[in-house]
Amino acid sequence: MEVNILGLIATTLFILIPTSFLLILYVKTASQEE
């Protein structure tokens, strides 16, 4: 089986970017409530 490196990188970025964005938003709102 041949692994498509570009596809793997694209999928990783596609998952990591929104996740980190939501995580930053959550941390900001959580720190504001305290």
From Swiss-Prot:
It is found in: Plastid, Chloroplast thylakoid membrane. It is a single-pass membrane protein. The keyword Transport does not apply. One of its GO terms (biological process) is photosynthesis, light reaction. Pfam families: PsbM. The chain crosses the membrane at residues 5-25. GO terms for cellular component: chloroplast thylakoid membrane; photosystem II. Its main location: plastid. The keyword Cytoplasm does not apply. InterPro entries: PSII_PsbM, PSII_PsbM_sf. Keywords: Chloroplast, Membrane, Photosynthesis, Photosystem II, Plastid, Reaction center, Thylakoid, Transmembrane, Transmembrane helix. Belongs to the PsbM family. PSII is composed of 1 copy each of membrane proteins PsbA, PsbB, PsbC, PsbD, PsbE, PsbF, PsbH, PsbI, PsbJ, PsbK, PsbL, PsbM, PsbT, PsbX, PsbY, PsbZ, Psb30/Ycf12, at least 3 peripheral proteins of the oxygen-evolving complex and a large number of cofactors. It forms dimeric complexes. One of the components of the core complex of photosystem II (PSII). PSII is a light-driven water:plastoquinone oxidoreductase that uses light energy to abstract electrons from H(2)O, generating O(2) and a proton gradient subsequently used for ATP formation. It consists of a core antenna complex that captures photons, and an electron transfer chain that converts photonic excitation into a charge separation. This subunit is found at the monomer-monomer interface. This is Photosystem II reaction center protein M. It comes from Pleurastrum terricola.
